[in-house]
Swiss-Prot record:
Pfam families cross-referenced by the UniProt entry: Methyltransf_25 (PF13649)
Signal sequence extent: none
Taxonomic classification: Bacteria, Bacillati, Actinomycetota, Actinomycetes, Mycobacteriales
GO CC entries: cytoplasm
Protein's name in the database: Trans-aconitate 2-methyltransferase
EC class: transferase
E.C. number(s) listed in UniProt: 2.1.1.144
Its biological purpose: Catalyzes the S-adenosylmethionine monomethyl esterification of trans-aconitate.
Keyword Nucleotide-binding listed: no
Keyword S-adenosyl-L-methionine carried by entry: yes
Gene: tam
Keywords: Cytoplasm, Methyltransferase, S-adenosyl-L-methionine, Transferase
CDD domains listed in its UniProt record: AdoMet_MTases (cd02440)
An annotated GO BP: methylation
Amino acid sequence: MWDPDVYLAFADHRGRPFYDLVSRIGAKRARRVVDLGCGPGNLTRYLARRWPEAIIEAWDSSPQMVAAARERGIDATTGDLRTWKPKPDTDVVISSAALHWVPEHADLMVQWATELPHGSWIAVQVPGNFETPSHAVVRALARREPYAKLMRDIPFRVGAVVGSPASYAGLLMDAGCKVDAWETTYLHQLTGKNPVLEWITGTALVPVRERLDDVSWEQFRQELIPLLDDAYPPRSDGTTMFPFRRLFIVAEVGGARRSADVS
């Protein structure tokens, strides 16, 4: 179960990639803007300010997140992103930190490029940190008893969870898009007690929490603390450096053909 309050504990840090993504969208005006994986809606509200004339459509698979988004005045829908279909007036599709949960997300992006009108925009951001300690120590601890028997069928994300900027760009260019793709590593300077643990509690640990009772969950968290401290040691000033790699893909549908015509 996703907890909007836990997720929002690092709202400033989590929000920066969203704004970096949206800043590269070239649409001056838009009829309909769609936020796929809207979460609690705190960032979706910015889209209404960026495109004040647009209808804002928001989706998330978590009923808890959708409820939180609706409390913020967002017309959000609970649904599987794999079933979403663009309406004819859709000019901008944004998905920030959501599509990595969908194994076939690259195919979805290409499908959207074939279904959206020419001149529309697709903007996607996904994390690319699945081999870092914040994920690796969780997988390692989950393989130990007494946890292993409870979590052996959790599809922990490992290996090629996401592609490279070049791989996404190539797929969308082949679909006729003009593409801007890049990656960056944010160096988050976290404060507070066990900040990396609290960060992943709102994301990577969600499927773990669903399998454990309250006592086992607290025990699991306590056993994670020294493992995370070894990987992300707190500084003497109280901050903890938390590197976080993210990938960005911004595509203009039909833009490649238009560029060729101009040249």
